[in-house]
Each structure stands twice: as structure tokens, then as C-alpha cells.
Amino acid sequence: MSTPARRRLMRDFKRLQEDPPTGVSGAPTDNNIMIWNAVIFGPHDTPFEDGTFKLTIEFTEEYPNKPPTVRFVSKVFHPNVYADGGICLDILQNRWSPTYDVSAILTSIQSLLSDPNPNSPANSTAAQLYKENRREYEKRVKACVEQSFID
Amino acid sequence: MAEAANVRQNLQNVPSIFEISASETLDNLIYPALSKIFDYFGLRLDFKLWGSLRIQEELSPLLTWLLQYLYLRKRASSFGESFYGLQRTVTTTGDLLNRRQQFASATLLTFMPYVERKLRTRITRHEDTSPWEQRLLSAFHAFHAAKAAHTFFYLVKYASNHSPIFRLLGLTLRYPSEPPKEDQWTYVVLKMLEVLAFFLQFVQWWYSNDQRRKVGGTLINPEAMPRKQLPKEVQQSLPQRGECPVCLLSIQTPTACSVSGYVFCWKCIVSHMKEHGTCPVTHYPISLDDLVRIYET
């Protein structure tokens, strides 16, 4: 059946294929358009460079009026990423807008990797290291980058 | 001979229906004039005074009440009645008003029109009105009919007061037998308020001119409202070929959000507004009144 959410998701997928943004990609799973798999490549000139981080995006029938649930599958050491892969990002919560499509969501998450917000930490260890011991923070990040190669 | 003189005295002391009608018209002008003044200063001060619009709506009737109460206390008449030299007296004794009658007069004079205005506004906006509101509006209709009947009886000298309110309060209108005794300060303040009465007439004339200009006059080219700076991701997400920003498909039943200027499908913008109360693109607060249907020819 075709619902507004599914029609919108097919539109998002089409836009993602026709005009792919740099460093991110995504596609629905084979049997369910409401669940997507995505990959974000670590931004250049950041400790995340060369990393390939996998994510899942779960949509509901309320999309685009409600944001999807986005989680990292790969291990990510980042102040705003929870241990279970959940992401603390304002546009996925209170500042959501239906004008964000999947491409914009992934691009925003990629930007979050470059510019953490340590004031609303999801990972207190990462937030503390990011503020007090940048060298150790980058070392931990590089470790999870190497881990992402194996996944 | 003495009887004839007495009859002439009585006739001279009773105001005509035209003066009463004129004084009521002047009283009814106070609220729209105050609202117009607030609108003017509100627009000049700050465009985003949006939140205090409710305060303005309640401030005008409150100021109106204060004005009327001041006149009733000092001159035993409403603002309009004082302007035409009338005075309220107790029907049976001919005495001036006591404190309770002053308060009741000011309150009825101000808040009955206020409540009626609120009711009519809600009905014209097609808001869901409860049964008691319908009954209250019917009561207002009945009141206006009773007032018309009273006016007719007063016109043919059959009744001593011209309004059911006056009958309820036991009051009547007369010319004062002697000029009011006031101290200097009160005299100055009331004189200034009488000058304000001329200003009210001017505001009404100005408002009529303003409306006439809006209808048929030449429009000065207004400056375009500045476009809100959107986050980069939103700018990139917005459709480039005129699709709806929410569903990204061709727009069905085009509807503009007058707060932000963006155009959406009717279904998309209404469902989003009912849930969030904001524009999907700019997050500005919006209501149903801000949506404008766009027709294609």
C-alpha cells in the first residue's frame, strides 16, 4: 500500500540517488522501505577521517511529521553518541522539521562528527576527553575508525 | 399659569432622544479608537510585539472602564453623556448616583459591549461555540429588542428612561440644574478628556480614510520582509522545482503560509499545523488564520 510516509521515502531515495551528497549514502532494506541502512564516511581533516560508519534508520508512518530513529551500528566514540549507537542531535528531536530528508539527516550527522557538542553529552567519557585531553580523545577515535574497517 | 410654567420646566429638563443617541455613539467610539491607537504604536514600536496582542485586547476595555468610572464619579454621567451636558439621576428621588450605582453603571457600560464583541468574533471565525454561548448571544438579541422598545416609549413620553439598563439601575437622564462644583485639578483633567473627545472623532475619520485608502487608493510599495536564514541542510533539502516542502511531491490544493511565505499542500500544512503549530520550514508559530488558499487560473 502507498501511504504519505512511503511516498515521501521513495522520493527521498530517488533524490539520494540522483544527487548524492559527499561522504554519505543510504538505501532501504530489500523487503521494508521503512528501515534503511546507511553509511557515513568520516569527514576529512578530523580524527574520524577514513572511517566507514554504518547506521540504521527506522521510519514510522508519521514521517515526515515525526523524525526517524537513527542509530549507529558501528562503534563510535563521540560525545553525542550513546553506547547503544543512539544519537543526541537537536534536529532529530525537538528541532525536527519535515523539510529534512534522509540526505539532510545523514549530512547533519556527518557534520556532528566534525563538531561535537560537549554541553549535551551522550557519552560523558568522550565529552570529558574532548574538553580536557584532546590527544587521548583523538587516539580513542582513531581506534574506533580502525574498528570500522573490520565491520 | 403656574401649571403651565411647571410643565414647561419639566419639558426643558428632559433630554431629547437625539442627544441620548449621540452620547451613546460617542461612548461606543472609545473602544475602537483606543484599539486603533494601540495598533498604531504597536506597529511602530516592534513588529514582533506579537505576544502582547492579547494584552492589548484586554487593555482597551479596562481603560474604557476607568474613563467611564472617572466621569461617573466626578460628573454623574458617562463620558459621552457628559459631553452633551447630560446627567444620571435616581428616577424616584432625583438624587445623584451613589457609589454602588456608579460602579454598576461603569461596569455595565463597558463590559456588556465587550462580552458581545467577543461572542460575535468567535462566531464569525466559525469557532466551536458552546450552547451557553449561543444562549448568551440570544440574550443580547433580546436585550437589543427591549432597548428598541424602550427607546420608542421614551420617544412618545410614555417611559421615563430610554434603556432597560437604566430601568434596571433605577436611573434616568436629565440636564443638571446647576453647574458641577469641582476643584481645579478635576476641572483641568476633565477638560483635557473633553479635548480627547474631539481627538476620538478625528481618529474615527482617520480610520475611515485609512480603510478607504486600503480599498481603492494607491499602494506604496512595501519593503519585502527579509528571508529567514535557514540551516544549510534545510536549504539543500527544499525542493527546487516548486514541490511541497513537506511531501516533496507536486503541490495539491496550494496553500501559502502567510507568516513565512512558503507554499505547501493543504493537507500537509494543516496536519503539521494541528500537531506542532509551527511552519515546517521556519518554525515560526502559525494558526489556521495564517493559511491562505492560492487559486490558479
Swiss-Prot record, chain A:
Pathway: Protein modification; protein ubiquitination. It catalyses: S-ubiquitinyl-[E1 ubiquitin-activating enzyme]-L-cysteine + [E2 ubiquitin-conjugating enzyme]-L-cysteine = [E1 ubiquitin-activating enzyme]-L-cysteine + S-ubiquitinyl-[E2 ubiquitin-conjugating enzyme]-L-cysteine. Residues 4-150 form the UBC core domain. It holds the Pfam family UQ_con. Its EC number is 2.3.2.23. SUPFAM superfamilies: UBC-like (SSF54495). The active site is at C88. GO terms for biological process: centrosome cycle; centrosome separation; DNA repair; endocytic recycling; heart development; negative regulation of apoptotic process; negative regulation of DNA damage response, signal transduction by p53 class mediator; negative regulation of ERK1 and ERK2 cascade. Keywords: ATP-binding, DNA damage, DNA repair, Nucleotide-binding, Nucleus, Transferase, Ubl conjugation pathway. Disruption phenotype: Lethality during the second instar-early third instar larval stages. Mutants show defective synaptic function as a consequence of mitochondrial failure. One of its GO terms (cellular component) is HULC complex. CDD domains: UBCc_UBE2A_2B. Coiled coil: none annotated. Signal peptide: none annotated. One of its GO terms (molecular function) is ATP binding. It is found in: Nucleus. Belongs to the ubiquitin-conjugating enzyme family. E2 ubiquitin-conjugating enzyme that accepts ubiquitin from the ubiquitin-activating enzyme E1 and transfers it to a E3 ubiquitin-protein ligase. Required for postreplication repair of UV-damaged DNA. Involved in the negative regulation of the Ras/MAPK signaling pathway in the wing by acting with the putative E3 ligases poe, Kcmf1 and Ufd4 to mediate the ubiquitination and proteasomal degradation of rl/MAPK. Required for in mitophagy. This is Ubiquitin-conjugating enzyme E2-17 kDa.
Curated annotation (Swiss-Prot), chain B:
The chain crosses the membrane at residues 17-44, 49-73, 99-119, 125-158, 192-219. Keywords: Membrane, Metal-binding, Peroxisome, Protein transport, Transmembrane, Transmembrane helix, Transport, Ubl conjugation pathway, Zinc, Zinc-finger. It comes from the Eukaryota. It is a multi-pass membrane protein. Zn(2+) binds at C244, C247, C265, C268. GO terms for biological process: peroxisome organization; protein import into peroxisome matrix; protein import into peroxisome matrix, receptor recycling; protein monoubiquitination; protein polyubiquitination. Residues 1-16, 74-98, 159-191 are peroxisomal matrix. CDD domains: mRING_PEX12. Pathway: Protein modification; protein ubiquitination. The keyword Transmembrane applies. It is found in: Peroxisome membrane. One of its GO terms (cellular component) is peroxisome. One of its GO terms (molecular function) is zinc ion binding. A zinc finger (RING-type) spans 244-283. Residues 45-48, 120-124, 220-297 are cytoplasmic. Component of the PEX2-PEX10-PEX12 retrotranslocation channel. Component of a retrotranslocation channel required for peroxisome organization by mediating export of the PEX5 receptor from peroxisomes to the cytosol, thereby promoting PEX5 recycling. The retrotranslocation channel is composed of PEX2, PEX10 and PEX12; each subunit contributing transmembrane segments that coassemble into an open channel that specifically allows the passage of PEX5 through the peroxisomal membrane. PEX12 also regulates PEX5 recycling by activating the E3 ubiquitin-protein ligase activity of PEX10. The three subunits of the retrotranslocation channel (PEX2, PEX10 and PEX12) coassemble in the membrane into a channel with an open 10 Angstrom pore. The RING-type zinc-fingers that catalyze PEX5 receptor ubiquitination are positioned above the pore on the cytosolic side of the complex. The RING-type zinc-finger is degenerated and only coordinates one zinc ions, preventing E3 ubiquitin-protein ligase activity. Belongs to the pex2/pex10/pex12 family. This is Peroxisome assembly protein 12. It comes from Drosophila melanogaster. The gene is Pex12.
